[in-house]
Amino acid sequence: MFRRIVPVLGLALGLGLASQAAMAQEQSPPPPPAVQGTPGKDFTGVSPANLAGIMNYCVEQQYVSYDEGNPVLYGLSEKYKATEQTVGNFDYALGTAGYFDSNGKRFYLVAYTNEDDRRAACHAAVKAAQPML
């Protein structure tokens, strides 16, 4: 009797897991919209708060070193109040998620398919932030 139940239970369990995976896939949010062109790693039109968030993203993802990115992150955050606890800052939040707004367009750093390009973009962001400190 036990031999008859085990295959049926295994099949029921397998079907249940498959249906849960399909439901989870249906409920997951759509991917972010495609990048609106390649910014060429030009961060000249990016706000200081957005650059501070980008520095946070780049340091967390290890595209720039802690020693290189954190002084920029802290400097921009202090000077431009990018991380005010009571108010919050949308540009900083965007940057922390890897997004940046430049000249009216929104870009996503992960859209650079090559990790070396993402590193180069983060290093370009460090250079763009230097005059703002």
Swiss-Prot record:
Localization: Cell membrane
Membrane topology: Peripheral membrane protein
Modified sites of kind Pyrrolidone carboxylic acid: 25
Keywords linked to the UniProt accession: Cell membrane, Membrane, Pyrrolidone carboxylic acid, Signal
Region (Disordered): 23-43
Residues annotated as signal peptide: 1-24
Main location: membrane
Function: Part of the alcohol dehydrogenase multicomponent enzyme system which is involved in the production of acetic acid and in the ethanol oxidase respiratory chain. Does not play an obligatory role for the alcohol dehydrogenase (ADH) activity.
Complexes and interactors: The alcohol dehydrogenase multicomponent enzyme system is composed of a dehydrogenase subunit I (AdhA), a cytochrome c subunit II (AdhB) and a subunit III (AdhS).
Protein's name according to its UniProt entry: Alcohol dehydrogenase, 15 kDa subunit
Species name: Gluconobacter oxydans (strain 621H) (Gluconobacter suboxydans)
Gene encoding the protein: adhS
